């Protein structure tokens, strides 16, 4: 074969390969001409397995992690209670007691009005946690004032606990520098919670991938693409993820007489062996499962072992209030279903598997553990 023919055949082969690749990229899929994106790819599973969707919990439950901002409105709370009844939610804990304002008068009114409205019109269906205003930490006497307000909220107005937002460590600044979670000026507040016998639910940091490069290896790539404000940069002054977690743990260690509920399982739901070891180190630490059910639902065997071992320290929480999303939580905790969808793709592009917890453990997670550590809740609506 002449050199010219060889060259021609080689060229034709290259053209054929390129053509095949281009055709593969331009296959018409549905109404989409061209390559589909990761966001668009939503294959319908062909797997045929038993399905047991759950619209309500098997037992009445306490949602320890919820946020409501109009609980002073009787009509809106009445609608909320009807939704709670459909889910079998016996009691909701509103962690946003003081709302989002740093105006002291408005903050006080928000807390007092919603506690009074729910106590008067919907008794025993809600508990409200108070909050701390960190925006004035640089003012003289801030610590003493914050401790006094906390005590007043609990003793005289009926607040059942303290919620600390992730802004502490991520956003709260003094002289243009972030205030650490373990700032010593906050120590008297943690100690006061122990004296008052109320729990502190604390959200520190965010998922570790928020500190990692936004590339094809980042498991939270889609979330960071759609919520760019969640990306953290130590080069721009942010604490590292490891620093924030250590700051939080310093607080737990220093205040062993105070009960802490580590929100979102302390961002270790994807490393249950590590979380298990931390629960040995910090006997005053409980965890709740808000916004991390997707992590548990992809490791059903490991999750079940963890729940069996730590059944006395885990609480049910949801975080964002979207009634239709509770079904995923019920199904992961109660069923043994396989390969069912999660409700929010940017949180989890993988499928869920049920853990199949026993009734004994379900009762503890759903309500018994919360009744144990949140003071003054009505136990009559919950089975023994």
Q: Where in this protein do the model-derived segments appear?
A:
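Acidic (Asp/Glu)-rich catalytic clusters
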Residues: 53-55, 80-87, 112-125, 149-158, ...
């Amino acid at each position: 074969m002449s050199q010219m023919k060889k060259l021609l055949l080689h060229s034709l082969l290259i053209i054929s390969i390129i053509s095949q690749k281009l055709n593969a990229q331009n296959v018409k899929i549905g109404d989409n001409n061209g390559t589909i994106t990761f966001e668009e790819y939503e294959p319908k599973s062909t797997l045929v397995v038993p399905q047991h969707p759950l619209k309500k919990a098997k037992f009445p439950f306490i949602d320890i992690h919820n946020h409501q901002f109009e609980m002073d409105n009787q009509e809106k709370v009445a609608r909320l209670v009807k939704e709670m009844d459909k889910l079998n939610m016996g009691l909701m804990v509103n962690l946003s007691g003081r709302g989002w304002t740093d105006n002291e008068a408005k903050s006080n009114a928000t807390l007092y009005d919603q506690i009074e409205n729910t106590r008067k019109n919907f008794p025993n269906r809600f508990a409200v946690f108070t909050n701390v205003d960190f925006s004035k930490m640089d003012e003289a006497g801030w610590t003493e004032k914050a401790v006094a307000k906390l005590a007043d909220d609990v003793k005289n107005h009926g607040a059942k606990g303290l919620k600390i937002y992730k802004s502490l460590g991520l956003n709260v600044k003094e002289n243009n520098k972030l205030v650490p979670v373990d700032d010593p000026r906050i120590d008297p507040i943690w100690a006061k919670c122990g004296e008052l016998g109320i729990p502190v639910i604390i959200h520190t940091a965010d998922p570790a991938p928020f500190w990692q490069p936004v590339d094809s290896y980042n498991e939270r790539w889609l979330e960071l693409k759609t919520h760019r404000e969640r990306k953290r940069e130590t080069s721009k002054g942010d604490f590292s993820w490891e620093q924030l977690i250590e700051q939080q743990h310093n607080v737990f260690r220093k205040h062993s007489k105070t009960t802490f509920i580590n929100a979102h399982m302390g961002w270790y739901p994807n490393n249950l062996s590590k979380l298990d070891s931390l629960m040995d180190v910090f006997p005053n630490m409980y965890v709740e499962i808000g916004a991390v059910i997707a992590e548990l639902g992809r490791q059903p065997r490991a999750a079940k072992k963890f729940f069996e071992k730590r059944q006395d320290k885990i609480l049910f929480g949801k975080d964002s209030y979207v009634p239709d999303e509770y079904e995923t939580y019920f199904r992961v905790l109660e069923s043994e279903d396989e390969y069912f969808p999660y409700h929010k793709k940017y949180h989890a592009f993988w499928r869920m598997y049920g853990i199949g917890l026993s009734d004994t453990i379900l009762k503890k997670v759903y309500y018994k553990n919360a009744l144990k550590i949140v003071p003054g809740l009505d136990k009559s609506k919950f089975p023994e």
